[in-house]
Amino acid sequence: MANSRRVSKVSSLIKREVSLMLMQDIKDDRVGAGMVSITEVEVSGDLQHAKIFVSIYGSEEARAETMEGLRASQGFVRRTLGQRIRLRRSPEVLFIEDRSLEEGDRMIHLINQLEIKDPEELEAQESEEMV
């Protein structure tokens, strides 16, 4: 098993290389259907598996199409990583859609919708209701 420092370094290298592949090397038109960004890469302790979390901006149809294209390109990504990063074995690559940014936006929107009232206004309103 690799130490945590090595795992972290490999994770950041994979993130950088896959980002470059998304911009330059992956030719599948489905991947271009939505704007894709890599939010995180989790590499297993033995460096054999890499979960690549992607955030996709666009409609639901574009997201589904983009994920389809990314899944179809997993073999290409694994081979290319093997050529660009010096590892004994190329890690198995798995793309996972990350909706945490979308959830964060939704939470911020809900918080902004709440009306935060001044305590004095609340007291005045309550006293009016009692009369």
UniProtKB/Swiss-Prot annotation:
Statement: the UniProt record of this protein carries the keyword Phosphoprotein: no
Annotated localization: Cytoplasm
Cellular component, GO annotation: cytosol
Matches recorded under InterPro entries: KH_dom-like_a/b, RbfA, RbfA_dom_sf, Ribosome-bd_factorA_CS
GO-annotated biological processes: maturation of SSU-rRNA
Keywords: Cytoplasm, Ribosome biogenesis
Source organism superkingdom: Bacteria
Pfam hit, one: RBFA
Role, per record: One of several proteins that assist in the late maturation steps of the functional core of the 30S ribosomal subunit. Associates with free 30S ribosomal subunits (but not with 30S subunits that are part of 70S ribosomes or polysomes). Required for efficient processing of 16S rRNA. May interact with the 5'-terminal helix region of 16S rRNA.
Name the record gives this protein: Ribosome-binding factor A
Organism of provenance: Picosynechococcus sp. (strain ATCC 27264 / PCC 7002 / PR-6) (Agmenellum quadruplicatum)
